[in-house]
């Protein structure tokens, strides 16, 4: 899945002013409405807050992926907020420190396809240390977009990174838990 097809530099924010989940979700919904990705900002916000109340969306690795499926969503897309200083976000074992927040907007018709593909692509990509480090080091929207493209090849002379095993395992666990939560939510809504 091409992540860049689902976002835009105008939907990427470095150190946004809001540091609580609800305030950040509300703030990130505004540019989605401005780009006509969502037709009704408040309906979309309520769908995200409802999903947040059903289960945590912090997935470890400094990542949170709040999301909403609503008739107000005109096309699948996401906003990205990056923080130098971590914010607190509800996780499976209490609040987690988060530095990357991907707010997903999913049309109901794509709840089982695009939604799951996007979650899997994001969590898989962000288990790669190189990608996560580039994203967290981004100082501009363009640098963040470049990190998401994952086009920068690794140096040929670099030895293989054996430290990837733990992030891959954690990413797989987080993906499985997130998919299970998403499927149970989709079944409950459907």
What are these regions (language model features)?
Residues 1-190:
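Cytosolic covalent-transfer regions centered on His/Cys nucleophiles
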């Amino acid at each position: 899945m091409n992540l860049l097809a689902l976002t835009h530099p105008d939907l990427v924010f470095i150190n946004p002013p809001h540091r609580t989940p609800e305030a950040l979700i509300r703030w990130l919904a505004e540019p989605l409405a401005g780009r006509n990705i969502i037709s009704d900002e408040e309906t979309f916000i309520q769908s995200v807050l409802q999903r947040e109340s059903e289960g945590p969306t912090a997935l470890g690795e400094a990542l949170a992926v709040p999301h909403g499926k609503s008739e107000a969503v005109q096309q699948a897309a996401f906003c990205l907020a990056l923080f130098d200083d971590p914010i607190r976000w509800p996780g499976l074992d209490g609040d987690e420190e988060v530095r990357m927040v991907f707010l997903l907007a999913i049309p109901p018709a794509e709840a089982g396809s695009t939604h799951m593909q996007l979650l899997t692509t994001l969590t898989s990509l962000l288990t790669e240390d190189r990608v996560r480090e580039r994203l967290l080091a981004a100082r501009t929207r363009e640098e963040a977009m470049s990190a998401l493209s994952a086009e920068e090849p690794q140096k040929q002379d670099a030895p293989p990174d054996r430290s990837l095993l733990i992030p891959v395992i954690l990413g797989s666990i987080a993906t499985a838990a997130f998919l299970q939560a998403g499927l149970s939510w989709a079944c409950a809504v459907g």
